[in-house]
Amino acid sequence: MEFVEDMRKIRNRKSLYVILFVLVAIFINGLNSNIETTKYDIYDHRVKQEMKVVFIADTHSCKYGEEQEELLQKVKSEKQDLILLGGDIIDDELPMQTGFDTIKDLAKSYPVFYVTGNHEIWSGKQEYIKRKIKSLGIEVLEGNIKEINVKGNLVNILGLEILR
């Protein structure tokens, strides 16, 4: 009988270790905030001069190095002409200021356009977020089209808002 009891303790301990391992793996995966880049070359006969656009989305108020330096250096290294922010820059659970820190320096050097993502809406502070982003010098597109000139190319940018 003692042998059976010892085997149960070992099995319970193994189960505990497996559960603990799975929880740690899930936690570590949740902390993954690596920067992924994908490059596309798009050709169109209407484009007079080559231009480079950087699209940033789903940063979710994560930290990318001290004062967001890792992300900012990555963006600046692209030598882009235009930056589009595709939503979920601000998270509905993490501190908003980290998200604002991610984008505040971008508008100083480049034309930047922003659309709201679902996490900004889920925060319940969508209007505050849009006002704050506008105050950083970033154009917020709210279902409107903006025509801009990029290196002699007329570009129309449409920002669609997600409805609740």
Where are these predicted regions, by residue range?
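N-terminal membrane-anchoring alpha-helices
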Residues: 1-47
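A generic structural signal for ordered alpha-helices
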Residues: 18-20, 53, 111, 153
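Beta-strand-turn-beta hairpins that frame and shape the catalytic cleft
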Residues: 35, 41-54, 138-139, 145-159
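Membrane-embedded segments
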Residues: 50-141
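Active-site-proximal loop/helix segment associated with metal-binding centers of metalloenzymes
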Residues: 161-164
